[in-house]
């Protein structure tokens, strides 16, 4: 079986939810960003968290770059109008690769993006073969290829783009079983290789939600690498050194873009992650 790469022991701070805490937005097109939020919360439990997901335009992997940039800026603006933000995390690889410049130009608070963990994977691989598992959009974008050229030019990079895996992760959080046969079919190009990747980059924030199932399908000894812990450390540093004094004593809250039955069914899941309520955010559909 494969193994999940651990990032070491991360200290936790005592939470004081009744006091004003820095407000941090974690945004994704779907629920994949919860994997990043979980890493940040583990390191920084005493923040006021907002989780926003775009269930109207989900998934972003097949959308144009222009659409994604305009949409993400619009949503972050709408959240900022409700709650002044100390920091925002774009917990979506696809959105991060195209929207960060526009967000950083518009807002005066730090904006953290998520990029595939190519650099650490290149350092970890023993056989020199690294797999990148991401959306088709992330696989195709020039930013991803620039990361590979910069940090993994001596490695053999095998890329798989899958929208279906995003859907599988969403379904899992809705309580559905994940088909191992479906994962085997998606991963077939690697599973058929004489020497498959020994290190796999989870290049979509949805995919850590499937790590348990991936461990059952990938060859024994395969390492899974994602950027969640690194994003948490970056968030902590920015909050200490560069973030504005934007705080709230309110409870953590989640926003969807449309209050559909599917979104309502996510409330128990969101509550397990510490978000007491789910509201519709007023943006143009």
From Swiss-Prot:
PROSITE patterns per record: ASP_GLU_RACEMASE_1, ASP_GLU_RACEMASE_2
InterPro entries, alphabetized: Asp/Glu/hydantoin_racemase (IPR015942), Asp/Glu_race (IPR001920), Asp/Glu_racemase_AS_1 (IPR018187), Asp/Glu_racemase_AS_2 (IPR033134), Glu_race (IPR004391)
Active site: 92, 204
GO molecular function: glutamate racemase activity
Top-tier EC class: isomerase
Domain of life the protein comes from: Bacteria
Keywords: Cell shape, Cell wall biogenesis/degradation, Isomerase, Peptidoglycan synthesis
Matching SUPFAM superfamilies: Aspartate/glutamate racemase
GO BP of this protein: cell wall organization; peptidoglycan biosynthetic process; regulation of cell shape
Binding site for substrate: 28-29, 60-61, 93-94, 205-206
NCBIfam families: glut_race, PRK00865.1-1
Family according to the record: Belongs to the aspartate/glutamate racemases family.
Function: Provides the (R)-glutamate required for cell wall biosynthesis.
Name this polypeptide is given: Glutamate racemase
Species of origin: Escherichia coli O6:H1 (strain CFT073 / ATCC 700928 / UPEC)
Lineage: Bacteria, Pseudomonadati, Pseudomonadota, Gammaproteobacteria, Enterobacterales
Name of the gene encoding the protein in the UniProt record: murI
